[in-house]
């Protein structure tokens, strides 16, 4: 058997991290077993499903490196097939026409509630002759639910889950306007796409009993089901905006790398020993459903940020530079040309050591593209005393003649200058850093000066020296 999994989102908004994790697990499971990962867009809600939302979805998955092995399937193009199955069940006597009006259905619900029963359809038209219906009356199509025994789902995460068939009602599979309901469309699509494993959030678990009715009525084999626990906020409550970012787009804009988000989402509810940092190849090699827990996971934004810092330090300097240049291009106080790009690239090994996100990285690199005179923050102003400014004027004469103007030579010159004037190295480096950056922090001062280049260093010292 070739494993075939699918991710089947409704394009009605941003790609939520819960859905992103489901997509990741489906992708990794298929890759681990040498199978295929498919994408189905459940866009039957035409009012809420927009092309913009579809584009955002595709972009988010591509950014995460989750790519389908076949062309995406759009559920809205398959409604004729869904209706065909409904009419087949009708012809086989496994479904029937229901002529109840909305008012009659509401009366059934009200009566059931008054009697302490679940408010659902009572099967009024299940065994009645359709000739009893008023001529031309609209109808829905309902499947005949089993009334005896129980339905058992052998879930690969949750274990055996069962429900008494008496608790299942004759659900609608075709609406009065002839359009299929979600439960029918999902089953038909999964069957036709040869899906072997349905891996999704456990908020779909109760749907599985209803979908199993359709599979069995059609005589189709059920796929294996695996229902993943949901992601909660740090406080254990349902993840919401008050907790922080919820969508892939938000995390991307906040400066998270796709490798870090993938790594974090994988470890959120799945375990394999003590391994925390896993490459994509390692994820594919190790991932299987037996490592998925049953309990809801809690989002830990601090841990995600830590992981992102680890992945930043491992990332290619040129790739990070491209991202930072793009982020700085929108800042009015920063100019980014090829010379500034070269400075950022040269200093990237030091810049990324302190950063937790790409936003941090852009903030720390911004001084490389600012023009003289720089604006100084409070810490820099405190460092740039009249005495420090005079000292920098003297230092400039030494820096002007360094050859080559690189980090090792600069380090030697700074140490020699400090020793000659009876200063500790920090007493020289800190005011110099303030003059170069407008702040009090940067990578090593020797590397910072080398990245700026002699002309820019002299210009920045000249703007503050007395």
From Swiss-Prot:
Annotated GO biological process: glutamyl-tRNA aminoacylation
Subcellular location: Cytoplasm
Motif mapping: 'HIGH' region: 9-19
Coiled-coil portions: none
Any single Gene Ontology cellular-component annotation: cytosol
Catalytic activity entry: tRNA(Glu) + L-glutamate + ATP = L-glutamyl-tRNA(Glu) + AMP + diphosphate
Binding site for ATP: 241
First and last residue of the signal peptide: none
Alphabetized InterPro entries for the sequence: aa-tRNA-synth_I_cd-bd, aa-tRNA-synth_I_codon-bd_sub2, aa-tRNA-synth_I_CS, aa_tRNA-synth_I_cd-bd_sf, Glu-tRNA-ligase_bac/mito, Glu/Gln-tRNA-synth, Glu/Gln-tRNA-synth_Ib_cat-dom, GluQ/Sye
Disulphide linkage map: none
GO MF: ATP binding; glutamate-tRNA ligase activity; tRNA binding; zinc ion binding
Spans traversing the lipid bilayer: none
One Pfam family in the UniProt entry: tRNA-synt_1c
Keywords: Aminoacyl-tRNA synthetase, ATP-binding, Cytoplasm, Ligase, Nucleotide-binding, Protein biosynthesis
EC number of this enzyme: 6.1.1.17
Motif 'KMSKS' region per record, residues: 238-242
Chief location category: cytoplasm
Purpose: Catalyzes the attachment of glutamate to tRNA(Glu) in a two-step reaction: glutamate is first activated by ATP to form Glu-AMP and then transferred to the acceptor end of tRNA(Glu).
Subunit text: Monomer.
Family: Belongs to the class-I aminoacyl-tRNA synthetase family. Glutamate--tRNA ligase type 1 subfamily.
Descriptive protein name: Glutamate--tRNA ligase 1
Species in which this protein is naturally found: Gluconacetobacter diazotrophicus (strain ATCC 49037 / DSM 5601 / CCUG 37298 / CIP 103539 / LMG 7603 / PAl5)
Lineage, top ranks: Bacteria, Pseudomonadati, Pseudomonadota, Alphaproteobacteria, Acetobacterales
């Amino acid at each position: 058997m070739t494993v075939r999994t699918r991710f089947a989102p409704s394009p009605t908004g941003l790609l939520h991290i819960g859905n992103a994790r489901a997509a990741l697990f489906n992708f990794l499971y298929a890759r681990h077993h040498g199978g295929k990962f498919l994408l189905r867009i459940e866009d039957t809600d035409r009012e809420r499903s927009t092309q913009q939302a579809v584009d955002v979805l595709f972009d988010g998955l591509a950014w995460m490196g989750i790519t389908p092995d076949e062309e995406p399937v759009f559920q809205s193009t398959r409604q004729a097939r869904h209706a065909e199955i409904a009419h087949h069940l009708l012809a086989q006597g496994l479904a029937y026409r229901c002529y109840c009006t909305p008012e009659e259905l509401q009366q059934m619900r009200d009566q059931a509630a008054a009697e302490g029963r679940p408010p659902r359809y009572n099967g009024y038209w299940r065994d009645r002759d359709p000739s009893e219906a008023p001529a031309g009356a609209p109808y829905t199509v309902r499947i005949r639910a089993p009334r005896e025994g129980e339905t058992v789902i052998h879930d690969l995460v949750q274990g055996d889950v069962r429900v008494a068939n008496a608790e299942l009602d004759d659900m609608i599979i075709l609406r009065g306007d002839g359009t299929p309901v979600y439960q029918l469309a999902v089953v038909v699509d999964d069957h036709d796409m040869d899906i072997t494993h349905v891996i999704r959030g456990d908020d779909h678990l109760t749907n599985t009993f209803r979908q199993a009715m359709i599979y069995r009525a059609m005589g189709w084999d059920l796929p294996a089901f695996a229902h993943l626990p949901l992601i909660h906020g740090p406080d254990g409550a349902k993840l919401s905006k008050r907790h922080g970012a919820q969508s892939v787009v938000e995390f991307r804009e906040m400066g998270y790398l796709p490798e870090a988000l993938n790594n974090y989402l994988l470890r959120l509810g799945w375990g394999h020993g003590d391994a925390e940092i896993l490459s994509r190849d390692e994820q594919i090699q190790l991932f299987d459903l037996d490592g998925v827990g049953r309990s809801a996971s809690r989002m830990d934004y601090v841990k995600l940020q830590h992981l992102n810092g680890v992945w930043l330090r491992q990332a290619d300097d040129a790739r990070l530079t491209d991202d930072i240049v793009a982020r700085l291009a929108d800042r009015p106080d920063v100019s980014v040309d090829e010379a500034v790009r070269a400075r950022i690239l040269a200093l990237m090994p030091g810049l990324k050591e302190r950063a937790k996100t790409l936003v941090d990285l852009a903030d720390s690199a911004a001084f490389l593209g600012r023009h003289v005179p720089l604006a100084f923050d409070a810490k820099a102003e405190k460092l740039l005393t009249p005495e420090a400014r005079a000292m920098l004027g003297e230092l400039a004469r030494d820096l002007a003649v360094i050859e080559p103007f690189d980090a090792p030579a600069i380090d030697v010159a700074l140490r020699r200058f400090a020793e000659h004037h009876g200063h500790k190295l920090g007493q020289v480096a800190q005011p110099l850093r303030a003059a170069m950056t407008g702040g009090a922090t940067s990578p090593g001062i020797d590397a910072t000066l080398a990245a700026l280049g002699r002309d820019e260093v002299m210009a920045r010292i000249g703007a503050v020296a007395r």
